[in-house]
């Protein structure tokens, strides 16, 4: 067989370069997606003001964060009065009255968790994919599923205790000494496993999402390349594949997202009010209760807002990440020539 027909030789990218590419993608994604969630939260707070101690979910496009209302007045960014008539009106009034930076309110503290989680996730996925392909062959279709599951498990396991600490620090201003005492007391009373109390509901949604996302992304990318007669995907092929695969995974896993949100919120109520945790209901039981109360459609509450958030986030993240890797591949290829 003519070696030319097999496409160009693949130039490897180092783990450090993968980390840099994923970090860049994570920051760009959060900068582009966060304004939509900020506006959504401001509209929610306008219609149903958040009381002190109330928690709400804040998304920067990379991961969801449980945030707790701290102050009674209008000092917090999500409590500022706006008199918005809708989404577009909220965008315009926030920019005009508060400055464009207000569209990224609350972002910096969440990036401390979201960027490392994304870097771990994407770098582990690529490293695992390369390892599995070297063992099982390039065309093994199960590789993206396995690599996606393991990478997501690893990222959530590393970040989950840190996110618990971040939420606690945000709900009450702790010094580092007080935080150390809080963690020590929690571990002595409930064991080390208590630091991963939010792990299960997150895994419930993120692992199936990751498996479906990476499998469909790789399949779509290959199909679009074949249709275009290309060996390597373009920026738009990566962008389109990311948006479509992310949208599909978002729809299928939405019931788990609804359950995750409910479990996270209940967990925070018990933690913050020092109420002893009752025997937790299983995911299946919570789903049955939702269906009994709101019908089958209750499992798909928030579908449109989730798609509006997930599709562009997945598209921007993966296309930026692949662009970064492509840039480093060219740099590495040039070094090999000289």
UniProtKB/Swiss-Prot annotation:
Membrane-spanning ranges: 19-39, 103-123, 145-165, 199-220, 239-259, 298-318
Disulfide bridge partners, by residue number: none
One term of GO molecular function: glutathione transmembrane transporter activity
Record GO cellular component, one term: mitochondrial inner membrane
Pfam family, one: Mito_carr
UniProt Solcar repeat ranges: 13-131, 139-223, 233-327
Organism superkingdom: Eukaryota
Subcellular location(s) per record: Mitochondrion inner membrane
GO BP terms: import into the mitochondrion
Function: Probable mitochondrial transporter required for glutathione import into mitochondria. Glutathione, which plays key roles in oxidative metabolism, is produced exclusively in the cytosol and is imported in many organelles. Mitochondrial glutathione is required for the activity and stability of proteins containing iron-sulfur clusters, as well as erythropoiesis.
Protein name per the record: Mitochondrial glutathione transporter SLC25A40
Gene coding for it: SLC25A40
